[in-house]
Design a protein with these regions (language model features):
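Conserved beta-strand-loop-alpha-helix junction that forms the acyl-donor binding cleft
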Residues: 127-142, 155
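A conserved beta-strand-loop-helix scaffold within acyl/acetyltransferase catalytic domains
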Residues: 58-65, 80-90
Length: 192
């Protein structure tokens, strides 16, 4: 993993310093998958697989051009991970998973990861498609600065249930991110 300086989330009253690291080795990738399995999060993070296996995860996150970030607390506890995949041009598709103990920090963790992706990869926008049934995920995405750009009929395949459901299409740009940060109760963060 590559070390980055500690980031502060910009959420008043929260002890929220953490590191963002790029996960570039299979040991780190496997540890994230094992954590998702232990916390029962693979059904949301990998909804298109009926029974996601470690090799599915490794194939997904290690494909060319993909960036897997991990947020880690100062004590070494992994808080979240985000997968950013090439989609079209300079737009990347995103998937962001917050581990259960860090749920209260989901918004600042995600915003910090999105900011890093914009600043370090030349990404012009982040795009996502979330099953309508995963309300918590798309509500969280809008809190993190994504804009709902549409509802696409039967766009998501829920493999475990064997059904198509509508998808909520989401888009975040550097501008929507900065606007959301500036409008947050704690105000904008110091430049990094």
């Amino acid at each position: 993993m590559e070390h980055t300086k500690t980031r502060h989330c910009g959420q008043a009253g929260v002890q929220d310093a953490f590191r963002l690291d790029a996960v570039r080795d299979d040991a780190g990738r496997k540890a994230l998958f094992a954590r998702m399995c232990r916390e029962g999060l693979t059904g949301c993070a990998m909804y298109a697989w009926a029974d996601p296996r470690e090799e599915d995860w490794l194939r997904l996150v290690s494909a060319p051009g993909r960036l897997l970030l991990q947020a880690t607390a100062p004590d070494g506890t992994v808080l979240a991970c985000g997968l950013f995949s090439p989609w079209r041009g300079q737009v990347r598709e995103f998937d962001f998973t917050v581990f259960r103990p860090a749920f209260p920090l989901a918004v600042p963790l995600a915003r910090a990861a999105f900011r890093r992706v914009f600043r370090q990869t030349g990404t012009s926008a982040l795009w996502g498609l979330c099953p309508v049934s995963n309300r918590h995920a798309w509500h969280l995405a809008t809190a993190c600065s994504f804009v709902i750009t549409g509802r696409l009929p039967a766009a998501c395949w829920l493999a475990r249930r064997g059904v198509h459901v509508d998808g909520i299409q989401l888009l975040c740009t550097p501008e929507t991110l900065e606007h959301a940060v500036a409008a947050s109760p704690s105000g904008p963060r110091a430049p990094q």
